[in-house]
């Protein structure tokens, strides 16, 4: 049994059982992957994949267990490499972050700028996607950190640490009836067509919860994953925008009026997460603390030592988080 064989079967699953696509991603040949998979199956005396002709159709029940263990083994191999790197080149390496557009565009720029200035030999890569894609990227080892607000049930296998609270703002054009108000009620908001986030992105579930709590149905006419896109359609008069308050920039958005929405919506909490098997390099601890100053190395280590995210929630329940 070879590590290469374990890597092949994991990557085949990551590529939805498409061996051709797997070969392209690994810069190798399709026959080479198929041969190594067969050799592993022959050695184990069991099928990892069911087949129809030359095509893989599904992972067998035994294969699912083997894939799970293979992921753990490969994760440990990565951890060994990280330990070695920490001792030989502590300021050199890579960092892969999976997050949403709102975090990438509004919460992370200054953090990343300072981080790159401090660690010029660390290559930083960002993957933007939906909460499902973010969770998938980290759980499969394609990203080191997940930074997210929504769909936290997708992150049960990760250590999730609370970073900051944030709320929403209502944005309208200067000639809109709501533009002259300092605050509005949810009943007033329900009278207008809304332009907001796609469900599952950037606190959208809290918007739906607030309307359900009030016994109202929001009239959502347009959704997008990108706050900048939402603001564009607000400018076109399509509706009232409901976006993260951090996404409203007085300098970049002088043609929009912001109305506070703290009285309508409860705050949301953005968290940063990583696999329990991840060996955190010194620069990774530093990135976490730059993003969330209360998450010092000692605090992170104490949280990792806990058995579940429920225990982590209890650990942080009396800590006042920053607000954005």
UniProtKB/Swiss-Prot annotation:
Compartments where found: Cytoplasm
Keyword Amino-acid biosynthesis set for record: yes
Gene: cysB
Domain HTH lysR-type: 1-59
Assembly notes: Homotetramer.
Keywords linked to the UniProt accession: Activator, Amino-acid biosynthesis, Cysteine biosynthesis, Cytoplasm, DNA-binding, Transcription, Transcription regulation
Lineage: Bacteria, Pseudomonadati, Pseudomonadota, Gammaproteobacteria, Enterobacterales
Primary localization: cytoplasm
Gene Ontology biological-process annotations: cysteine biosynthetic process; DNA-templated transcription; regulation of DNA-templated transcription; response to X-ray
CDD domains: PBP2_CysB
GO CC field: cytosol
Protein name: HTH-type transcriptional regulator CysB
Function: This protein is a positive regulator of gene expression for the cysteine regulon, a system of 10 or more loci involved in the biosynthesis of L-cysteine from inorganic sulfate. The inducer for CysB is N-acetylserine. CysB inhibits its own transcription.
Coiled-coil annotated residue ranges, if any: none
NCBIfam families: PRK12681.1 (NF009326), PRK12684.1 (NF009327)
Disulfides per UniProt: none
GO-annotated molecular function: DNA binding; DNA-binding transcription factor activity; identical protein binding; transcription cis-regulatory region binding
Family: Belongs to the LysR transcriptional regulatory family.
Organism of derivation: Escherichia coli (strain K12)
DNA-binding region listed in the record: 19-38
Pfam families: HTH_1, LysR_substrate
Keyword Transcription found: yes
């Amino acid at each position: 049994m070879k590590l290469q064989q374990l890597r092949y079967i994991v990557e085949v699953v990551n590529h939805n059982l498409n061996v051709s696509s797997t070969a392209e991603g690994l810069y190798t040949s399709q026959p080479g992957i198929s041969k190594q998979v067969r050799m592993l199956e022959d050695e184990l005396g069991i099928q990892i994949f069911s087949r129809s002709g030359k095509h893989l159709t599904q992972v067998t029940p035994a294969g699912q267990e083997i894939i799970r263990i293979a992921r753990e083994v490969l994760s440990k191999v990565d951890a060994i490499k990280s330990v070695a790197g920490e001792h030989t080149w502590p300021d050199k390496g890579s960092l892969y972050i999976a997050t949403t557009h709102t975090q990438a565009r509004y919460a992370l720029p200054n953090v990343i700028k300072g981080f790159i200035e401090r660690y010029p030999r660390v290559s930083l890569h960002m993957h933007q996607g939906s909460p499902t894609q973010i969770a998938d990227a980290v759980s499969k080892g394609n990203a080191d950190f997940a930074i997210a607000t929504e769909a936290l049930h997708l992150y049960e296998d990760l250590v999730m640490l609370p970073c900051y609270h944030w709320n929403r703002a209502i944005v309208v054009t200067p000639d809109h009836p709501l533009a002259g108000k300092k605050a509005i009620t949810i009943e007033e908001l329900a009278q207008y067509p809304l332009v907001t986030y796609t469900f599952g992105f950037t606190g959208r579930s809290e918007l739906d919860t607030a309307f359900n709590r009030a016994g109202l149905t929001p009239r959502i006419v347009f959704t997008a994953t990108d706050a900048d896109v939402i603001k564009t359609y607000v400018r076109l008069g399509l509706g009232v925008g409901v976006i993260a308050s951090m996404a409203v920039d007085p300098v970049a958005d002088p043609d929009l009026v912001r109305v506070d929405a703290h009285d309508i919506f409860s705050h949301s909490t953005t968290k940063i997460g990583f696999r329990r098997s991840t060996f955190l390099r010194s620069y990774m601890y530093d990135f976490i603390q730059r993003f969330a100053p209360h998450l010092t190395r000692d605090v992170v280590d104490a949280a990792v030592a806990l058995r579940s995210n429920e225990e982590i929630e209890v650990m942080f329940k009396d800590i006042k988080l920053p607000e954005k």
